[in-house]
Amino acid sequence: MTIKYAILVSACFLASTLPLLAQQKGQWVPGGFGLNAGVIPDPGITYANVAVNYSADRLNNSNGDRILQNVTGTYSFWVDENIVYYVPNHKILGGYFMPYISINAATGSLVADLPPLLPGSMSGIRLSGGASGLADTYVEPLNMGWHLGNRVDFNVGYAFVAPTGRYSAGASDNVGSGYWGNNVTSGTTFYITKNKGTSANLFTDFESHGQKTVSSAVSGQRSKITPGQAFTMEWGIGQALPLKKDLSQLAQLGLVGYDQWQVTSNGGNYLVAGIPVAASQVPYYSVHGIGFQANYILPAKGVTLFFKYYDEYLAKARIQGRTFVFGGSWTLRIPKPAPKK
Protein backbone atom coordinates (compact mmCIF):
# COMPACT_ATOMS: atom_id res chain seq x y z
CA MET A 1 0.00 0.00 0.00
CA THR A 2 2.85 2.34 0.85
CA ILE A 3 4.58 1.63 -2.49
CA LYS A 4 1.38 2.22 -4.47
CA TYR A 5 0.76 5.46 -2.58
CA ALA A 6 4.32 6.63 -3.25
CA ILE A 7 3.93 5.91 -6.97
CA LEU A 8 0.62 7.81 -7.03
CA VAL A 9 2.11 10.82 -5.26
CA SER A 10 5.12 10.76 -7.62
CA ALA A 11 2.87 10.71 -10.66
CA CYS A 12 0.75 13.53 -9.27
CA PHE A 13 3.86 15.51 -8.38
CA LEU A 14 5.31 15.21 -11.90
CA ALA A 15 1.99 16.01 -13.53
CA SER A 16 1.53 19.11 -11.40
CA THR A 17 5.12 20.29 -11.02
CA LEU A 18 6.07 20.33 -14.70
CA PRO A 19 3.41 22.85 -15.78
CA LEU A 20 3.92 24.70 -12.49
CA LEU A 21 7.62 25.28 -13.11
CA ALA A 22 6.96 26.03 -16.77
CA GLN A 23 4.69 28.85 -15.61
CA GLN A 24 7.21 30.16 -13.05
CA LYS A 25 7.60 33.72 -14.26
CA GLY A 26 6.50 37.24 -13.50
CA GLN A 27 3.65 39.03 -15.23
CA TRP A 28 6.21 41.34 -16.78
CA VAL A 29 7.64 39.67 -19.89
CA PRO A 30 11.36 40.58 -20.12
CA GLY A 31 12.60 42.07 -23.37
CA GLY A 32 10.23 45.03 -23.65
CA PHE A 33 12.99 47.57 -23.05
CA GLY A 34 16.65 47.67 -24.01
CA LEU A 35 18.04 50.72 -25.76
CA ASN A 36 16.35 54.09 -25.11
CA ALA A 37 14.82 52.88 -21.84
CA GLY A 38 14.51 56.39 -20.43
CA VAL A 39 13.66 58.28 -23.62
CA ILE A 40 10.52 60.42 -23.40
CA PRO A 41 8.17 60.36 -26.42
CA ASP A 42 7.58 63.70 -28.13
CA PRO A 43 4.35 65.49 -27.12
CA GLY A 44 1.44 63.92 -28.94
CA ILE A 45 0.20 60.37 -29.42
CA THR A 46 2.61 57.48 -29.91
CA TYR A 47 1.49 54.06 -31.10
CA ALA A 48 3.78 51.05 -30.91
CA ASN A 49 3.20 47.51 -32.08
CA VAL A 50 5.50 45.01 -30.41
CA ALA A 51 5.63 41.28 -31.19
CA VAL A 52 7.27 39.03 -28.59
CA ASN A 53 8.12 35.38 -29.22
CA TYR A 54 9.43 33.19 -26.42
CA SER A 55 10.31 29.51 -26.74
CA ALA A 56 12.01 27.00 -24.46
CA ASP A 57 12.74 23.28 -24.35
CA ARG A 58 14.60 23.12 -21.05
CA LEU A 59 13.34 23.02 -17.45
CA ASN A 60 15.78 23.84 -14.64
CA ASN A 61 15.85 23.25 -10.90
CA SER A 62 16.63 25.83 -8.24
CA ASN A 63 20.37 25.45 -8.90
CA GLY A 64 20.02 26.16 -12.61
CA ASP A 65 20.64 22.53 -13.60
CA ARG A 66 18.48 20.82 -16.19
CA ILE A 67 16.01 18.39 -14.66
CA LEU A 68 13.86 15.60 -16.07
CA GLN A 69 16.47 14.73 -18.68
CA ASN A 70 14.18 12.12 -20.21
CA VAL A 71 11.28 14.55 -20.56
CA THR A 72 10.99 16.18 -23.97
CA GLY A 73 8.77 19.03 -25.00
CA THR A 74 8.46 22.70 -25.79
CA TYR A 75 6.90 25.74 -24.21
CA SER A 76 6.29 28.77 -26.40
CA PHE A 77 4.14 31.84 -26.74
CA TRP A 78 3.57 34.84 -28.96
CA VAL A 79 2.37 38.17 -27.60
CA ASP A 80 1.24 41.06 -29.80
CA GLU A 81 1.34 44.28 -27.78
CA ASN A 82 -0.57 47.34 -28.94
CA ILE A 83 0.74 50.29 -26.95
CA VAL A 84 -0.60 53.85 -26.94
CA TYR A 85 1.16 56.75 -25.19
CA TYR A 86 -0.28 60.22 -24.70
CA VAL A 87 2.14 63.04 -23.84
CA PRO A 88 0.64 66.53 -23.33
CA ASN A 89 2.59 69.52 -24.63
CA HIS A 90 3.04 71.10 -21.22
CA LYS A 91 5.19 70.27 -18.25
CA ILE A 92 4.08 69.09 -14.83
CA LEU A 93 6.55 69.32 -11.94
CA GLY A 94 9.20 70.17 -14.50
CA GLY A 95 8.62 66.96 -16.45
CA TYR A 96 6.30 65.30 -18.93
CA PHE A 97 3.20 63.30 -18.06
CA MET A 98 3.37 60.18 -20.25
CA PRO A 99 0.69 57.58 -19.38
CA TYR A 100 0.19 54.57 -21.61
CA ILE A 101 -1.85 51.42 -22.08
CA SER A 102 -0.93 48.10 -23.67
CA ILE A 103 -3.71 45.92 -25.07
CA ASN A 104 -2.34 42.48 -25.78
CA ALA A 105 -3.22 39.36 -27.72
CA ALA A 106 -1.42 36.09 -27.04
CA THR A 107 -0.97 32.59 -28.42
CA GLY A 108 0.77 29.93 -26.36
CA SER A 109 1.41 26.22 -26.16
CA LEU A 110 2.92 23.68 -23.79
CA VAL A 111 3.73 20.12 -24.86
CA ALA A 112 5.64 17.71 -22.62
CA ASP A 113 6.19 13.96 -22.90
CA LEU A 114 6.79 12.28 -19.53
CA PRO A 115 8.50 8.88 -19.40
CA PRO A 116 6.68 5.77 -18.06
CA LEU A 117 6.20 6.10 -14.30
CA LEU A 118 5.50 2.43 -13.55
CA PRO A 119 8.02 -0.41 -13.98
CA GLY A 120 7.33 -2.37 -17.16
CA SER A 121 5.07 0.31 -18.59
CA MET A 122 5.66 1.08 -22.25
CA SER A 123 3.79 4.37 -22.44
CA GLY A 124 4.34 7.65 -20.68
CA ILE A 125 2.21 10.72 -20.12
CA ARG A 126 1.79 13.61 -22.52
CA LEU A 127 0.90 17.00 -21.12
CA SER A 128 -0.33 19.54 -23.62
CA GLY A 129 -2.22 22.77 -23.73
CA GLY A 130 -2.55 25.83 -25.85
CA ALA A 131 -4.77 28.79 -26.54
CA SER A 132 -5.00 32.20 -28.14
CA GLY A 133 -7.01 35.33 -27.52
CA LEU A 134 -7.07 38.59 -25.60
CA ALA A 135 -4.41 38.54 -22.89
CA ASP A 136 -4.03 40.58 -19.72
CA THR A 137 -4.04 44.38 -20.10
CA TYR A 138 -1.21 46.58 -18.86
CA VAL A 139 -2.12 50.14 -17.82
CA GLU A 140 0.37 52.76 -16.62
CA PRO A 141 -1.85 55.73 -15.60
CA LEU A 142 0.92 57.50 -13.67
CA ASN A 143 4.17 57.94 -15.55
CA MET A 144 6.44 60.99 -15.45
CA GLY A 145 9.57 61.73 -17.47
CA TRP A 146 12.28 64.35 -17.09
CA HIS A 147 15.23 65.62 -19.11
CA LEU A 148 17.92 66.00 -16.45
CA GLY A 149 20.41 68.33 -18.08
CA ASN A 150 21.73 67.33 -21.49
CA ARG A 151 22.93 63.88 -20.54
CA VAL A 152 20.10 62.03 -18.75
CA ASP A 153 16.49 61.13 -19.54
CA PHE A 154 14.59 59.54 -16.66
CA ASN A 155 11.05 58.32 -16.09
CA VAL A 156 9.20 56.66 -13.22
CA GLY A 157 5.66 55.34 -13.00
CA TYR A 158 2.98 53.16 -11.43
CA ALA A 159 1.09 50.56 -13.45
CA PHE A 160 -1.35 47.73 -12.92
CA VAL A 161 -2.08 44.52 -14.78
CA ALA A 162 -5.78 43.74 -15.24
CA PRO A 163 -6.56 40.01 -15.67
CA THR A 164 -8.58 40.46 -18.86
CA GLY A 165 -7.19 37.29 -20.45
CA ARG A 166 -9.20 34.09 -20.25
CA TYR A 167 -8.30 32.07 -17.17
CA SER A 168 -9.91 29.11 -15.44
CA ALA A 169 -8.09 27.10 -12.80
CA GLY A 170 -6.90 23.80 -14.26
CA ALA A 171 -7.84 24.65 -17.85
CA SER A 172 -5.40 23.94 -20.68
CA ASP A 173 -6.51 26.91 -22.80
CA ASN A 174 -5.70 29.80 -20.47
CA VAL A 175 -4.44 33.03 -22.00
CA GLY A 176 -4.33 35.29 -18.93
CA SER A 177 -2.56 35.02 -15.60
CA GLY A 178 -5.73 34.96 -13.52
CA TYR A 179 -4.71 37.65 -11.03
CA TRP A 180 -4.17 41.39 -10.64
CA GLY A 181 -0.70 42.89 -10.53
CA ASN A 182 0.81 46.19 -9.40
CA ASN A 183 4.02 47.57 -10.90
CA VAL A 184 6.48 50.34 -10.08
CA THR A 185 8.70 51.11 -13.07
CA SER A 186 11.66 53.32 -13.91
CA GLY A 187 13.68 54.01 -17.04
CA THR A 188 17.01 55.79 -17.41
CA THR A 189 19.06 56.72 -20.46
CA PHE A 190 22.51 58.22 -19.90
CA TYR A 191 24.10 59.81 -22.94
CA ILE A 192 27.80 59.02 -22.77
CA THR A 193 28.75 61.41 -25.58
CA LYS A 194 27.71 65.04 -26.08
CA ASN A 195 26.00 64.29 -29.38
CA LYS A 196 23.89 61.61 -27.61
CA GLY A 197 25.07 59.00 -30.08
CA THR A 198 26.33 56.60 -27.40
CA SER A 199 24.03 55.69 -24.53
CA ALA A 200 23.73 53.43 -21.50
CA ASN A 201 20.20 52.39 -20.52
CA LEU A 202 18.47 50.78 -17.55
CA PHE A 203 14.82 49.84 -17.00
CA THR A 204 13.44 48.38 -13.77
CA ASP A 205 10.09 46.88 -12.82
CA PHE A 206 8.96 45.79 -9.37
CA GLU A 207 5.73 43.82 -9.37
CA SER A 208 3.44 42.60 -6.62
CA HIS A 209 0.57 40.21 -7.19
CA GLY A 210 -2.96 39.48 -6.09
CA GLN A 211 -4.52 36.11 -5.34
CA LYS A 212 -5.21 33.51 -8.01
CA THR A 213 -7.14 30.25 -7.99
CA VAL A 214 -5.26 27.08 -8.93
CA SER A 215 -6.47 23.53 -9.42
CA SER A 216 -5.04 20.15 -8.44
CA ALA A 217 -3.71 18.36 -11.52
CA VAL A 218 -5.42 15.08 -10.60
CA SER A 219 -8.47 15.64 -8.42
CA GLY A 220 -9.37 19.09 -9.68
CA GLN A 221 -9.62 20.46 -6.15
CA ARG A 222 -9.13 24.21 -6.05
CA SER A 223 -7.08 26.39 -3.78
CA LYS A 224 -5.78 29.94 -3.73
CA ILE A 225 -2.20 31.14 -3.92
CA THR A 226 -0.51 34.53 -4.11
CA PRO A 227 2.46 34.51 -6.51
CA GLY A 228 5.62 35.98 -5.02
CA GLN A 229 6.76 39.48 -5.89
CA ALA A 230 9.28 39.88 -8.71
CA PHE A 231 11.93 42.37 -9.79
CA THR A 232 13.02 42.80 -13.42
CA MET A 233 16.01 44.73 -14.74
CA GLU A 234 16.59 45.38 -18.44
CA TRP A 235 19.68 47.12 -19.75
CA GLY A 236 21.37 48.17 -22.98
CA ILE A 237 24.46 49.92 -24.31
CA GLY A 238 24.02 51.35 -27.79
CA GLN A 239 25.52 53.43 -30.55
CA ALA A 240 23.59 55.50 -33.10
CA LEU A 241 25.05 55.73 -36.62
CA PRO A 242 23.93 58.20 -39.32
CA LEU A 243 22.83 56.53 -42.54
CA LYS A 244 22.58 59.92 -44.26
CA LYS A 245 24.63 63.05 -43.74
CA ASP A 246 21.55 65.12 -42.91
CA LEU A 247 20.71 62.65 -40.08
CA SER A 248 17.31 61.94 -41.62
CA GLN A 249 17.97 58.20 -41.25
CA LEU A 250 19.74 56.58 -38.32
CA ALA A 251 20.75 53.09 -37.35
CA GLN A 252 21.19 52.17 -33.70
CA LEU A 253 22.99 49.01 -32.62
CA GLY A 254 23.63 47.73 -29.15
CA LEU A 255 24.15 45.02 -26.58
CA VAL A 256 21.07 44.33 -24.43
CA GLY A 257 20.10 42.01 -21.63
CA TYR A 258 17.53 41.25 -18.94
CA ASP A 259 17.43 39.79 -15.45
CA GLN A 260 14.34 38.78 -13.49
CA TRP A 261 14.14 37.48 -9.93
CA GLN A 262 11.37 36.34 -7.63
CA VAL A 263 12.04 38.28 -4.42
CA THR A 264 9.34 37.07 -2.00
CA SER A 265 7.84 33.64 -1.41
CA ASN A 266 4.49 32.48 -2.75
CA GLY A 267 1.54 32.52 -0.38
CA GLY A 268 -1.28 30.02 0.09
CA ASN A 269 -1.35 26.29 -0.70
CA TYR A 270 -1.30 23.99 -3.68
CA LEU A 271 -3.17 20.70 -3.55
CA VAL A 272 -1.17 17.65 -4.65
CA ALA A 273 -3.39 14.53 -4.68
CA GLY A 274 -5.66 16.39 -2.27
CA ILE A 275 -2.82 17.08 0.15
CA PRO A 276 -2.17 20.78 0.93
CA VAL A 277 1.38 21.79 0.11
CA ALA A 278 2.53 25.28 1.06
CA ALA A 279 3.17 27.36 -2.05
CA SER A 280 6.14 28.88 -0.23
CA GLN A 281 7.94 25.54 -0.72
CA VAL A 282 8.21 26.21 -4.44
CA PRO A 283 11.75 27.59 -4.94
CA TYR A 284 12.31 31.17 -6.05
CA TYR A 285 12.76 31.52 -9.81
CA SER A 286 15.18 33.74 -11.72
CA VAL A 287 16.23 34.16 -15.34
CA HIS A 288 19.02 36.03 -17.13
CA GLY A 289 19.38 36.74 -20.85
CA ILE A 290 21.74 38.63 -23.14
CA GLY A 291 21.54 39.59 -26.79
CA PHE A 292 21.52 42.44 -29.29
CA GLN A 293 19.20 45.14 -30.59
CA ALA A 294 19.06 46.89 -33.96
CA ASN A 295 16.92 50.00 -34.63
CA TYR A 296 16.12 51.92 -37.80
CA ILE A 297 15.02 55.49 -37.03
CA LEU A 298 13.44 58.24 -39.13
CA PRO A 299 13.58 61.18 -36.67
CA ALA A 300 11.62 63.71 -38.73
CA LYS A 301 8.78 61.25 -39.35
CA GLY A 302 8.67 59.98 -35.76
CA VAL A 303 9.13 56.39 -36.94
CA THR A 304 11.25 53.67 -35.34
CA LEU A 305 11.61 50.01 -36.35
CA PHE A 306 13.40 47.59 -34.05
CA PHE A 307 14.55 44.00 -33.63
CA LYS A 308 15.89 42.31 -30.49
CA TYR A 309 17.15 38.84 -29.69
CA TYR A 310 17.94 37.44 -26.22
CA ASP A 311 19.43 34.08 -25.31
CA GLU A 312 18.86 33.00 -21.72
CA TYR A 313 22.16 31.78 -20.29
CA LEU A 314 20.89 31.03 -16.77
CA ALA A 315 17.50 30.15 -15.31
CA LYS A 316 16.59 28.75 -11.90
CA ALA A 317 13.37 26.95 -10.95
CA ARG A 318 11.79 27.66 -14.33
CA ILE A 319 12.19 27.16 -18.06
CA GLN A 320 15.18 28.48 -20.01
CA GLY A 321 14.91 29.60 -23.62
CA ARG A 322 15.18 32.52 -26.01
CA THR A 323 13.25 35.70 -26.78
CA PHE A 324 12.66 37.55 -30.05
CA VAL A 325 11.14 41.05 -30.03
CA PHE A 326 10.37 43.12 -33.10
CA GLY A 327 8.03 45.87 -34.21
CA GLY A 328 7.79 49.60 -34.68
CA SER A 329 6.44 52.87 -33.32
CA TRP A 330 5.07 56.08 -34.79
CA THR A 331 4.46 59.43 -33.11
CA LEU A 332 1.79 61.92 -34.18
CA ARG A 333 3.37 65.08 -32.80
CA ILE A 334 0.97 67.60 -31.24
CA PRO A 335 1.52 70.38 -32.07
CA LYS A 336 3.02 69.58 -35.44
CA PRO A 337 6.63 70.77 -35.67
CA ALA A 338 7.34 73.73 -37.92
CA PRO A 339 9.04 72.70 -41.18
CA LYS A 340 12.78 73.24 -41.34
CA LYS A 341 13.88 76.17 -43.46
Protein language model features and the residues they cover:
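Surface-exposed strand-loop-strand hairpins of Gram-negative outer-membrane beta-barrel proteins
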Residues: 24-26, 54-79, 118-130, 172-173
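Transmembrane beta-strands of outer-membrane beta-barrel proteins
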Residues: 45-47, 95-103, 152-158, 182, ...
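Residues on the lipid-exposed face of transmembrane beta-strands in outer-membrane beta-barrel proteins
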Residues: 35-37, 49, 81-88, 139-144, ...
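Short loop/turn motifs that connect adjacent beta-strands in outer-membrane beta-barrel proteins
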Residues: 23-24, 37-44, 56, 88-98, ...
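Residues that define the transmembrane beta-barrel architecture of outer-membrane proteins
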Residues: 74-80, 128-138, 176-182, 225-233, ...
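Transmembrane beta-strands of outer-membrane beta-barrel pores
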Residues: 51-57, 103-109, 160-166, 204-210, ...
